């Protein structure tokens, strides 16, 4: 590993220690908390929209968020490791088959909607959750008996 890549990895780790971002990709609706300075006041502003692209790598990684504001499409590019980003909330996952959703720029209204991705559980997971829930109930019952 060369020196520059090593320094970038250290900086990424340092920033990730302060705040954790959820794993999201193109098609997901996200709410980005951005620190905005107006004169002497500083406040946190939420910017909610569809992530249409992720690009770059390391410290230079960015993601583009598109939202419709007063009937106009507005896109904003955020660096992942920017100190101005307080956090990112994942609002919903989208079902798309592309990594870059630039085609949404030409669509309006219902045509620009993205279907929500459904997460299906396997039978084993439900059984494991039930077993864990019963174990907790039994523990509580034992503590109450004592």
From Swiss-Prot:
BP-aspect Gene Ontology terms: translation
InterPro entries: Ribosomal_bL19, Ribosomal_bL19_CS, Ribosomal_bL19_sf, Translation_prot_SH3-like_sf
Any single GO CC term annotated in Swiss-Prot or TrEMBL for this entry: cytosolic large ribosomal subunit
Gene3D superfamilies xref list: 2.30.30.790
Domain of life: Bacteria
SUPFAM superfamilies with a match to the protein in the record: Translation proteins SH3-like domain
Keywords: Ribonucleoprotein, Ribosomal protein
GO molecular function, one term: structural constituent of ribosome
Main function: This protein is located at the 30S-50S ribosomal subunit interface and may play a role in the structure and function of the aminoacyl-tRNA binding site.
Similarity section: Belongs to the bacterial ribosomal protein bL19 family.
UniProt name for this protein: Large ribosomal subunit protein bL19
Organism, as annotated: Bartonella quintana (strain Toulouse) (Rochalimaea quintana)
């Amino acid at each position: 590993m060369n020196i520059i890549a090593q320094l970038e990895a250290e900086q990424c780790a340092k920033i990730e220690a302060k705040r954790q971002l959820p794993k999201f990709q193109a098609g997901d609706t996200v709410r980005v908390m951005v620190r905005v300075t107006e004169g002497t006041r500083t406040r946190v502003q939420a910017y909610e929209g569809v992530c249409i692209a992720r690009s770059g790598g390391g410290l230079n990684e960015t993601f583009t968020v598109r939202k419709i504001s007063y009937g106009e499409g507005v896109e904003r590019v955020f660096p992942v490791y920017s100190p101005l980003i307080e956090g990112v909330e994942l609002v919903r996952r989208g079902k798309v088959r592309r990594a870059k959703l630039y085609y949404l720029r030409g669509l309006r209204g219902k045509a620009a909607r993205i279907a929500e991705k459904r997460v299906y559980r396997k039978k084993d997971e439900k059984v494991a959750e039930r077993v864990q829930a019963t174990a907790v109930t039994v523990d509580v019952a034992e503590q109450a008996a004592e």
